Amino acid sequence: MIGRISGQLAEKNPPEVLVDCNGVGYEVLVPMSTFYNLPGLGEKVSLLTHFVVREDAQILYGFGSATERAAFRQLIKISGVGPRTALSVLSGMSVEELAQAVTHQEAGRIIKVPGIGKKTAERLLLELKGKLGADIGVQVSVSSDSQSDILQALVALGYSDRDAALALKALPKDIGVSDGIKLALKALAK
């Protein structure tokens, strides 16, 4: 098993990078979160990896952090979720966002990831419950039920997770759901 790869970054073509290790170029598929944090071409790079051997291919998947790799490994254990789908999930949302969606059982957030339908999202929520978060070193913020409901409502209305979370932070902690949604919508309308 190849656990880590270090070398010079030779090419960047999302989602694939080419890492030159002493004259040997390794093609590594990375989630977009890792891709955006890569150094410039020609600079030294080090990635944690997961090596997949199939009948027709040998593929290296690279990650910028141990939590990303651990989440990837949890995802590919799920029936019907292969490495490509797991990479898509990690490209569409951060590990923290995924852990939060699993904790709050928010299928709507996972469905927004390209290639993930309702059934797959529900299976992910079911299979990952209790497996993401503290197990892989992710801090999941525990909020009140009303805050969770407000966040879900804003996401359902089409706001991004980031915008909804920012609007939620500006609200008082003990606000009711309906008042919280109204205030958050006013804040987001500005």
Swiss-Prot record:
GO biological process: DNA recombination; DNA repair
Biological role: The RuvA-RuvB-RuvC complex processes Holliday junction (HJ) DNA during genetic recombination and DNA repair, while the RuvA-RuvB complex plays an important role in the rescue of blocked DNA replication forks via replication fork reversal (RFR). RuvA specifically binds to HJ cruciform DNA, conferring on it an open structure. The RuvB hexamer acts as an ATP-dependent pump, pulling dsDNA into and through the RuvAB complex. HJ branch migration allows RuvC to scan DNA until it finds its consensus sequence, where it cleaves and resolves the cruciform DNA.
Protein name per the record: Holliday junction branch migration complex subunit RuvA
Region of interest: Domain I: 1-64
InterPro entries referenced in this protein's UniProt entry, alphabetically: DNA_helicase_Holl-junc_RuvA_I, Hlx-hairpin-Hlx_DNA-bd_motif, NA-bd_OB-fold, RuvA, RuvA_2-like, RuvA_C, RuvA_C_sf
Gene Ontology CC, one term: Holliday junction resolvase complex
SUPFAM superfamilies to which the protein is assigned, alphabetical: DNA helicase RuvA subunit, C-terminal domain, Nucleic acid-binding proteins, RuvA domain 2-like
Disulfide bridges in this chain: none
Assembly information from the UniProt record: Homotetramer. Forms an RuvA(8)-RuvB(12)-Holliday junction (HJ) complex. HJ DNA is sandwiched between 2 RuvA tetramers; dsDNA enters through RuvA and exits via RuvB. An RuvB hexamer assembles on each DNA strand where it exits the tetramer. Each RuvB hexamer is contacted by two RuvA subunits (via domain III) on 2 adjacent RuvB subunits; this complex drives branch migration. In the full resolvosome a probable DNA-RuvA(4)-RuvB(12)-RuvC(2) complex forms which resolves the HJ.
Region (Domain III): 142-190
A Pfam family the protein falls into: RuvA_N
Chief location of this protein within or outside the cell: cytoplasm
Upper taxonomic lineage: Bacteria, Pseudomonadati, Pseudomonadota, Betaproteobacteria, Burkholderiales
Keywords, in A-Z order: Cytoplasm, DNA damage, DNA recombination, DNA repair, DNA-binding
Flexible linker: annotated segments: 137-141
Family affiliation: Belongs to the RuvA family.
Residue span of region Domain II: 65-137
Domain writeup: Has three domains with a flexible linker between the domains II and III and assumes an 'L' shape. Domain III is highly mobile and contacts RuvB.
Location relative to the cell: Cytoplasm
GO molecular function: ATP binding; four-way junction DNA binding; four-way junction helicase activity
SMART domains (alphabetical): HhH1
HAMAP family, A to Z: DNA_HJ_migration_RuvA
